[in-house]
UniProtKB/Swiss-Prot annotation:
The gene is psbE. SUPFAM superfamilies: Cytochrome b559 subunits (SSF161045). It is found in: Cellular thylakoid membrane. It comes from Prochlorococcus marinus (strain SARG / CCMP1375 / SS120). With its partner (PsbF) binds heme. PSII binds additional chlorophylls, carotenoids and specific lipids. One of its GO terms (biological process) is photosynthetic electron transport chain. This is Cytochrome b559 subunit alpha. One of its GO terms (molecular function) is heme binding. Its cofactor is heme b.
Length: 82
């Protein structure tokens, strides 16, 4: 081991190894597919509690609601949704 070395493999050696690409050829597409399914199925909306695009506005509304009282905004929006 050379002086000042941390004992880790050089990055270039890692990314040129067959073992690295065998592992990552499976994991990287799997992460992408899992993320795509998480968003496309709507599970992301449920997990984070955000409204779905079709529920932002009611059908009778033509513009976004305006909150007039800063500290009573939740009550105003809840009243709007009833």
């Amino acid at each position: 081991m050379a002086a000042g070395s941390t004992g880790e493999r050089p990055f270039f050696e890692i990314i040129t190894s067959v073992r690295y690409w065998i592992i990552h050829a499976v994991t990287l597409p799997a992460i992408f597919i899992a993320g795509f399914l998480f968003v496309s199925t709507g599970l992301a909306y449920d997990a984070f509690g955000t409204p779905r695009p079709d529920t932002y506005f009611q059908a009778s509304e033509t513009k976004a609601p305006v909150v007039s009282q800063r500290f009573e905004s939740k009550a105003q929006l809840d009243l709007r949704l009833k």
